[in-house]
Amino acid sequence: MRTFNSKEKKFWDWFVKNKTKLEEFIDSNQKDYSIYLELTSELKSYNELLNPELTGDEEGVYCFIVTPDGIREGVEPTTKIIYSGPEIVGWKFFRFRQAKDKFGIKINEVDVDIADIKILRKLDIENKGVDITVCFKNYEDANSDFKTAGFLMLDHVVGEMNMLARVDAVDFLSWNDIPKQEETITLLALRKEIEEKLY
C-alpha cells in the first residue's frame, strides 16, 4: 500500500471495507444506488470537487474513476487520491475519464452518438490550446441536456485530461448553422490533433 495522509487513508479505508458492496452494485447493473451515494459522500468529504464513476471492463475488472467534472482546480486532488490508493485484486483506479473510441449517451430525450457530432476547431499551436464548437445533428439551444451530453462526450472520447489541459473554450451549434466555408472533423480526429499537435 502506498503512503498517504490521514484524509486519504480515511477514504481508502472506507473503500476497502465496502469493496464487496461496490462490486455487487456494479454487477447488479446499478439498481440500488445507496452504496454509490455513500461513495460519493465519502469522496466529497475528501474534496468537494470530485465525483466517482464505477464500471466494469471487458475483462471483468472493476473500474473506479475519479473525475473533477472538467474543473481545473480538481486536477491535483484527483491525482492525489488515485495515486494514494492501495492495490486491490480485481480493481483498476483511474484519474479522469479515459478516452474511448466508441461512446454514446442518452439524457432524457437527448440521445447522442459519436456520429451525431461534428467539430469546428481553432488550434493555437504556439500556446498549445484549442477552441472548439460542438455541432449536434439535432441541436436545440433551449435544451440544456445537449450541452451536458456534449461535455460528457468530449470527456469520454477526447479524454478528460486533454479537455482540462488543452481545450480553452467550448461552444455549441446545430449542423444547420455550420458555416459552409468551415471544415469540420470528428471527435476522434480532434483527440488525435490535440495529442499530436498540442503536446
What does each of the following model-derived ranges do?
Residues M1-V61, D69-Y199:
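Long, contiguous binding/interaction regions
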